[in-house]
Amino acid sequence: MERANHSVVSEFILLGLSKSQNLQILFFLGFSVVFVGIVLGNLLILVTVTFDSLLHTPMYFLLSNLSCIDMILASFATPKMIVDFLRERKTISWWGCYSQMFFMHLLGGSEMMLLVAMAIDRYVAICKPLHYMTIMSPRVLTGLLLSSYAVGFVHSSSQMAFMLTLPFCGPNVIDSFFCDLPLVIKLACKDTYILQLLVIADSGLLSLVCFLLLLVSYGVIIFSVRYRAASRSSKAFSTLSAHITVVTLFFAPCVFIYVWPFSRYSVDKILSVFYTIFTPLLNPIIYTLRNQEVKAAIKKRLCI
């Protein structure tokens, strides 16, 4: 390969979720349904927010972008995993693997920052309601959105820069259904201990900073809401609870994946499935069930 004279691995073999043929068929059917649900659920939110003028507010603008990221994030690994359930030999090219890792980290990092932006939006809406539309202006929203993608791009680029310097000259079997960076690094033909620490530090620092910002934002909001009228507090907590649920679902797998990133336990596969597939599926459900405005707009759009 032209990438490096000492690198001879041109493809990687993915072991998938299970070697059982019966389970392969079951997984194929199950994950096909789940993937369709991801696309339809997030697409429904995108269309509803775009075409319903009542939802043209900062909160729903950010929510529609979250749905877009979730839909694209699931699309980078899930379709290939579904097709691989029907294949005896599951392979992916080196550049295909590299692209998969790059976009997974790009979108994952962007989603973390977008969740922070959504927490800021809720803080302004609940703690400074009279100045909400002034503070959360289109210019501010655009800045928050672009900052989210910029941070995701820098995070992903720094992670992938490590990969370009690694020689792969022998082992090429990845015990997962997609190219997971910690697992790919282990296959390099050199000592990668320092590199493993750098990868953990990079992802861990971004996750920690975002998580702390979210904790501070939600802490201030909850403290503020305690002293509001009961009716207003109920509505505020209803909106806030959906955000907290989504944040918990997003960060919980990250904690396990990056606290024990180079372990060989099968729990890593379960967490990866949850992070890349079930979180994008659950997000639109959570926001729809907890939000009367979205439910009403969807019913109107579907003529129910």
UniProtKB/Swiss-Prot annotation:
GO terms for cellular component: plasma membrane. It is found in: Cell membrane. Disulfide bonds join C97-C189. Residues 1-25, 80-100, 159-195, 259-269 are extracellular. The keyword Glycosyltransferase does not apply. SUPFAM superfamilies: Family A G protein-coupled receptor-like. Keywords: Cell membrane, Disulfide bond, G-protein coupled receptor, Glycoprotein, Membrane, Olfaction, Receptor, Sensory transduction, Transducer, Transmembrane, Transmembrane helix. It is a multi-pass membrane protein. It holds the Pfam family 7tm_4. Odorant receptor. Belongs to the G-protein coupled receptor 1 family. This is Olfactory receptor 4K13.
